[in-house]
Regions:
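N-terminal amphipathic alpha-helix/helix-capping segment at the start of soluble metabolic enzymes
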Residues: 1-27, 120, 283
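Active-site mouth loops of central-metabolism enzymes
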Residues: 19-37, 56, 75-83, 139-152, ...
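Hydrophobic faces of well-ordered beta-strands that scaffold small-molecule active sites
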Residues: 22-28, 53-55, 77-81, 99-101, ...
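Glycine-rich, proline-tolerant flexible connector loops at the mouths of alpha/beta enzymes
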Residues: 29, 35, 46-69, 100-108, ...
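Alpha-helix-loop-beta-strand connector modules within alpha/beta enzyme cores
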Residues: 60-81, 114-126, 186-197, 281-283
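Glycine-enriched alpha-helix->loop->beta-strand junction motifs that scaffold or abut catalytic
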Residues: 73-75, 92-99, 120-123, 190-196, ...
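Hydrophobic or amphipathic alpha-helical targeting/insertion segments
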Residues: 86-127
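Catalytic alpha/beta core domains of metabolic enzymes, predominantly
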Residues: 131, 139-285
Length: 352
């Protein structure tokens, strides 16, 4: 299944759906009212590769801050709204490029209608978000527990509320911390709607556990052609979310750009600090936009052969190492110059 015929939705100056590239999202963890701190974090996220950013808007002060934040950043700004419809309206009036709501907790139909009216007037897309943790009691009872079917029915019910108000500039997100339930729900929802989907595993956990859950869940979903935007939700620095999202997309062949670093797991032949060297290489190449593979190998015995699928690599040895290109040894390099030699080669890559 490849959902290249999903509805096209414009978010600020970005476009999703209709076969457009999958965009990477994150969410700030600053107080939105603190414009300086929020902008500072968003600019870091932009530099890491974030393409859409969401901020919580729990107060009118936070809604007002959106205007100044919007002026100082370069990616679409999404307002995350819970419970109070007035926050959604205020956020849109202050420049939000999209709002995220759950019509089920905004209040009466009149309140939802008031939000939709402003969105319609300004042509601002609404992301309808449903989480398994807040599934309605009647759906839990209907399906004898929290299930993929219940999550999908809840989401489509909420979408129907907005459609009945004459608006269809929508994105849907359905999330669960149960990875396989989340996958099943997306498979089911993708068969029932052409709206673009924002995909993520909610409450995934810390950097280690969250990355594993997100890689498995997002990998299974995206590999089926499902998903138009993604977020890797981690308990930690949001910049780590962007790094992980980029790697997931690149691993699936859905995104090019950025150096892929591969390294051997080390063995008794290793005579250098390969773990430290591999980490240094990963850090060193973050600002280099080449679309190539770099190998970091632990010894000169198997290093060249194992690195032949990489475009370039280094293999460590006691006192000296090797510079390798496509599995062929190019030259020997003093151990303390391996990193600098590799960086110089990368910076001059493609030059005659």
């Amino acid at each position: 299944m490849h959902r290249d015929n999903t509805k096209i939705v414009k978010i600020g100056d970005r476009v999703i759906g209709g076969g457009n590239p999958i965009l990477i999202q994150s969410m700030t963890n600053t107080k939105t009212e603190d414009v300086e701190a929020t902008v500072r974090q968003i600019l870091r996220l932009e530099q890491a590769g974030c393409e859409i950013i969401r901020c919580t808007v729990p107060t009118l002060e936070a809604a007002a801050a959106m205007k100044e934040i919007r002026k100082q950043i370069h990616i679409p700004l999404v307002a995350d709204i819970h419970f109070d419809y007035k926050m959604a309206i205020a956020a849109m009036e202050n420049g939000a490029d999209k709002i995220r709501i759950n019509p089920g907790n905004i209040g009466s139909r009149d309140k939802v209608a008031a939000v939709v009216a402003v969105a319609k007037e300004r042509n601002i897309p609404i992301r309808v978000g449903v989480n398994s943790g807040s599934l309605e009691k009647e759906l839990v009872e209907k399906y004898h527990g929290v299930t993929a079917q219940g999550i999908v029915e809840s989401a489509l019910d909420k979408v129907g509320i907005i459609e009945d108000l004459g608006y269809d500039n929508l994105v849907i997100s359905i999330k669960s911390s149960d990875v396989m339930m989340c996958v099943a729900a997306h498979e089911l929802l993708a068969q029932k709607t052409q709206y673009p989907l924002h995909v993520g595993i909610t409450e995934a956990g810390t950097v280690t556990s969250g990355n594993i859950k997100s890689a498995i869940g997002l990998g299974l979903i995206l590999h089926q052609g499902i998903g138009d935007t993604i977020r890797v939700s981690l308990t930690g620095d949001p910049v780590e979310e962007i790094k992980s999202a980029r790697l997931i997309l690149r691993t699936l062949g859905l995104r090019k750009g950025g150096i892929e670093v591969v390294s051997c797991p080390t063995c008794g032949r290793t005579r250098i600090d390969l773990i430290g060297l591999a980490n240094q290489v990963e850090k060193m190449v973050e600002d280099i936009s080449l679309d190539i593979k770099v190998a970091v190998m632990g010894c000169a015995v198997n290093g060249p052969g194992e690195a032949k699928e990489a475009d370039i690599g280094i293999a460590g040895g006691l006192g000296e190492g090797l510079l390798i290109k496509k599995g062929e040894i190019v030259k020997k390099v003093p151990e303390d110059q391996l990193l600098a030699t590799l960086r110089e080669e990368l910076l001059n890559w493609g030059q005659a």
